[in-house]
Swiss-Prot record:
Gene: Ggta1l1
Binding note for cofactor: Binds 1 Mn(2+) ion per subunit.
Taxonomic lineage: Eukaryota, Metazoa, Chordata, Craniata, Vertebrata
InterPro entries per record: Glyco_trans_6, Nucleotide-diphossugar_trans
Name of this chain's protein: N-acetyllactosaminide alpha-1,3-galactosyltransferase-like 1
Source organism: Mus musculus
Cofactor: Mn(2+)
Length: 319
């Protein structure tokens, strides 16, 4: 009799364990299936030369020293990439921080324009990280668009908003985002989409050129020049000056960037140095070269006189 009870308990435990594993790992399983589909088709990914031609824009820098494309209007054929990515049924995440006054009209304008122009025809998840999720505007989204809101958790003794935001983003990527999307962008809320922002921008790591500093000489870039700072770049070094407005890539690459930023800013705080997110961003891309570089057309400040190199503004920046 005792043996039968023990056998029944053992069977019950096995069933419960199987059910727990089934539901606990269902999200991971779905994500792995997506990754497998991408991996299976990886050999068919269009070669850069089939969709990108830097010779069509001899008036600008269209290829980096490490042979990554710098995307300008006229250099890329989006249709070639569409044929590839449509087969994979990918999902792209777009994360934005809505704090203080930016949680109302600027956020509404950003999401409304992103809904119209960001990755049209693809599954998109908008992630809003806000001080409070109760007073956010109402958003009416188009097909294939979903929205998630999270409240930013506070940190004791943390007076740096960027550090708080990145710590929150770090947690969300680990807990959730990495299982939901194939590519992830983090964008500043104070900008408005003006034209299609498409799959030509997708890559393992994506950096945005700063509209103002693109037309300046490298020796004038506002890199961190203090040797004791983790963001230090010597005067004779550097490639471009990147803007904090847009950062992207695979979730794990974005996660790595965030981790390096948190480490760098923490080290600087220990050394009693005040440094900016953008200085650490530039140090990161100085060491870890981006796979895609977005030209100033993808983030242009309309206050500037528009030079002839800027043919088609994708996003307007509003400081």
């Amino acid at each position: 009799m005792q043996y039968k009870k023990e056998a029944l308990l053992l069977m019950l435990f096995a069933v419960l364990l199987a059910l727990t594993q089934r539901f606990s790992y269902s999200r991971t399983k779905d994500h792995l299936q997506k990754m497998y589909a991408c991996w299976k088709d990886h050999l068919e990914e269009p070669h850069l030369s089939t969709w990108f031609d830097p010779k069509k824009r001899p008036d600008v820098i269209a290829t980096t020293g490490w042979l990554a494309p710098v995307l300008w209007e006229g250099t890329y054929n989006r249709e070639v990439l569409e044929q590839y990515y449509k087969r994979l049924n990918i999902t792209i995440g777009l994360a934005v921080f809505a704090t203080g006054n930016f949680s109302k009209e600027p956020l509404r304008r950003f999401i409304k324009s992103a809904d119209k122009y960001f990755m049209v025809g693809y599954n998109v998840i908008f992630y809003i990280l806000a001080d409070s999720t109760y007073n956010l505007p109402y958003f009416e989204l188009g097909p294939l668009r979903t929205l998630k809101t999270w409240r930013l958790f506070e940190e004791e003794m943390c007076q740096d908003c960027n550090l708080r935001n990145m710590n929150n983003m770090h947690s969300k990527i680990i807990q959730c985002i990495q299982y939901e999307v194939n590519f992830l962008f983090m964008m500043a809320v104070n900008q408005t989409f003006k034209n299609n922002f498409g799959v030509e921008t997708l890559g393992k790591s994506v950096a945005q050129l700063h509209a103002w500093w693109y037309f300046k000489k490298p020796r004038d870039f506002p890199y961190e020049r203090r040797t004791k700072s983790a963001a230090f770049i010597p005067f004779e070094k550097g490639d471009f000056y990147y803007h904090r407005a847009i950062v992207g890539g695979t979730p794990l690459n974005v996660l790595n960037l965030i981790e390096q930023y948190i480490k760098g800013i923490t080290d600087d705080n220990t050394n009693k140095l005040v440094s900016t997110f953008e200085s650490h961003l530039n140090k990161y891309f100085f060491i870890n070269k981006p796979a895609r570089v977005l030209s100033p057309e993808y983030n242009w400040d309309p206050r500037f006189k528009t030079p002839p190199e800027i043919k088609h503004i994708k996003i307007a920046w509003k400081p």
